[in-house]
């Protein structure tokens, strides 16, 4: 597609996909992806990074919650990576976990992050998993 992704074209862009891997960096785009994936019945694999922490979840899948049910409001101005920064390798770690979640869904492995939020701390290598 040779266009900007927005709410006017989200359904058309995503309608022939089986999974959406969110690699965006802002709430507005994630909310648009969430709305479209929910309407189309397509899982959304969310990944977010801020400073030394990354979050991963699978939304709109196996009766799990949507992105906006867990993150109803944006606080982007407070949590801006331009001012707070992130450690450079964190996005690749989070992206790899997102790819793993996509593979698990494709091959039918039920032990995925639907209904859970995985939080990874790059400084301590601590992983916390929260039931949503």
Predicted regions and their residues:
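Conserved SAM/SAH-binding loop
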Residues: 1-10
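Glycine-rich phosphate/adenylate-binding loop
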Residues: 9-19, 23-132
């Amino acid at each position: 597609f040779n266009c900007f992704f927005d709410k006017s074209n989200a359904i058309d862009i995503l309608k022939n996909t089986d999974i959406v891997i969110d690699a965006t960096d802002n709430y507005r785009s994630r909310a648009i992806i969430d709305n479209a994936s929910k309407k189309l019945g397509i899982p959304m694999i969310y990944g977010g990074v801020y400073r030394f922490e990354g979050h991963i979840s699978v939304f709109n899948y196996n009766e799990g919650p949507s992105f906006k049910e867990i993150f109803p409001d944006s606080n982007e101005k407070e949590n801006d990576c331009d001012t707070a920064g992130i450690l450079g390798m964190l996005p690749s770690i989070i992206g790899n976990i997102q790819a793993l979640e996509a593979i698990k869904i494709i091959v039918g492995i039920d032990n995925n992050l639907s209904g859970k939020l995985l939080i990874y701390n790059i400084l301590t290598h601590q992983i916390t998993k929260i039931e949503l």
